[in-house]
Design a protein with these regions (language model features):
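Non-catalytic, conserved peripheral segments adjacent to functional cores
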Residues: 1-94, 108-133
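Glycine-centered loop/turn positions within well-structured domains
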Residues: 103
Length: 133
């Protein structure tokens, strides 16, 4: 099985009412969740822009769009398989990205997106390898 075959889209439950919305991006019950803490971060992408463009030989990540929409472009570094995943907020999903899969998040809309991410490792520049899509 190639690394890109390990990418999983995990449906989430978006709870909305008059006050706003609630969404669990990481529940702690995920298949590949580590037993230690990594990093949680947010990133915003402007219309027509892309964020990322790299892969991690060791770290794995989980991505959840919490506002707007984007396309997550993936490429397996070993097999060179490609995959594009549409990530509109309304779809309420988290995408697991295994190590060795290059990723870039492209804003294909006319509004900003906000992405919530979790990685199982603390940031290490040596584990972030630039990749041009």
């Amino acid at each position: 099985m190639s690394q890109i075959d390990k990418v999983r889209i995990i449906p989430r439950r978006l709870i909305a009412d008059d006050r706003g919305w609630f969404l669990k991006a990481i529940t702690g019950t995920e298949e590949d969740i580590p037993s230690h803490t990594g990093e949680v971060y947010l990133t915003m992408g402007k219309p027509g822009q892309a964020k990322g463009g790299h892969y991690h030989p060791e770290a794995v990540e989980w991505f959840t769009i919490i506002e707007g929409s984007a396309i997550l472009k993936l490429e397996d570094m070993e097999t060179h398989e490609h995959r594009d995943i549409e990530m509109p907020f309304e779809k309420a999903q988290t995408v697991f990205i295994p190590n060795g899969v290059a990723h870039i998040v492209v804003n294909n809309s006319d509004k900003d997106f906000i992405l919530l991410a979790y990685t199982d490792k603390l940031y290490d520049p040596a584990d972030t390898i630039k990749f041009d899509f």
